[in-house]
């Protein structure tokens, strides 16, 4: 470990190692500013992604290994025990803005008997796929750049090996094909809405609207105050939550199989007198998520209907 002597925090800082990192990163930044410098670092050493001139190590991004472990451990936990892990699931945002974090679902997690991403998840075959779609929706709505290792988009059940190519034949199976198609829609959504990436590292543009224990609701915004909301139900039962907003909401993407009869439902409960605030009741089916877009048209209709 270049940060601590003998790789142990209690042994003190490795001054020579820190000098080396700062020198190399500064020179690379000067000569090749187009190159991304990314640290795979599990320590809590500060300012890993701060510029060298400000006392940092000069990396552009740092792997958020805490987010990865907490999220995957949560999804590997039986449904009935997840409420006790809510704080751990939410913990990543308590330190996220200390560095420019990158969210990794990397090669490290799909080798050496660790199982693939989908195989780590609790539940039966159908529940694993449902949660995998929820996981990627959460990944794309959580602040931070994204890293997903090849084969993850196929929902591989076989661990990665350098001796064979990814299992492209999996796309001939309906569940894998539907997951792959969902990811395509999610990528398209990500590119279409700057609020999902424009202000990753500014806390003013992220907000928890509901923090579990069943439904987690995230709002992402951009400079122009355009926003999207993701509501994700990680329990095995349909769940409901209440949101207080100044507009209506319309669904533009969900993780549900088109053949399923369940739907995500948004209904108006009340409107505050002398206020633009609207109380919305949001019902999300078990192990599913929905992307919601503010709707000015719906807002006008709601006001007319309630007044």
Question: How would you describe each model-predicted region?
Answer:
Residues 86, 131-132:
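Amphipathic coiled-coil/heptad-repeat helices and related helical stalk/stem segments
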Residues 79-81, 124-127:
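Short, flexible loop segments at the rims of nucleotide/cofactor-binding pockets, characterized by
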Residues 41-43, 107-109, 222, 286-288:
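Short, flexible loop/turn elements at secondary-structure junctions
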Residues 43, 109-111, 255, 298:
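Short loop/turn segments at secondary-structure transitions that flank enzyme active sites
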Residues 1-11, 100-125:
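Active-site clefts of carbohydrate-active enzymes
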Residues 1-102, 138, 155-188, 198-200, ...:
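Active-site-proximal helices and loops of the catalytic beta/alpha 8
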Residues 134-140:
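Hydrophobic targeting/anchoring helices
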């Amino acid at each position: 470990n270049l940060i601590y002597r003998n790789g142990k925090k209690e042994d003190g800082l490795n001054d020579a190692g820190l000098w080396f990192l700062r020198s190399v990163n500064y020179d690379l930044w000067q000569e090749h500013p187009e190159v991304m410098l990314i640290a795979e670092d599990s320590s809590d050493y500060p300012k890993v992604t701060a510029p060298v001139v400000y006392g940092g190590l000069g990396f552009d991004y740092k792997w958020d290994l805490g987010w990865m472990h907490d999220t995957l451990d949560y999804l590997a936990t039986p449904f009935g025990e997840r409420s006790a892990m809510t704080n751990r699931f939410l913990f990543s945002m308590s330190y996220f803005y200390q560095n420019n974090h990158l969210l990794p679902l990397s090669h490290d997690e799909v080798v050496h008997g660790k199982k693939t991403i989908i195989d780590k998840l609790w539940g039966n075959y159908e529940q694993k796929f449902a949660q995998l779609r929820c996981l990627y929706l959460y990944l794309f709505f959580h602040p931070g750049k994204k890293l997903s290792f090849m084969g993850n988009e196929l929902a591989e059940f076989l661990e990665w090996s350098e001796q064979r190519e990814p299992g492209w034949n999996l796309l001939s199976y309906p569940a894998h094909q539907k997951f792959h198609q969902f990811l395509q829609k999610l990528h398209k959504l990500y590119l279409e809405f700057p609020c999902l990436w424009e202000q990753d590292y500014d806390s003013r543009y992220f907000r928890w609207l509901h923090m579990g224990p069943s439904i987690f609701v995230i709002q992402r915004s951009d400079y122009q105050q355009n926003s999207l909301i993701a509501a994700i139900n990680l329990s095995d039962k349909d769940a409901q939550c209440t949101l207080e907003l100044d507009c209506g909401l319309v669904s533009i993407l969900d993780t549900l199989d088109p053949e399923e009869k369940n739907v995500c439902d948004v209904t108006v409960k009340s409107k505050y007198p002398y206020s633009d605030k609207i109380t919305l009741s949001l019902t999300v089916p078990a192990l599913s998520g929905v992307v919601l877009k503010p709707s000015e048209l719906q807002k006008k209709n709601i006001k007319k209907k309630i007044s």
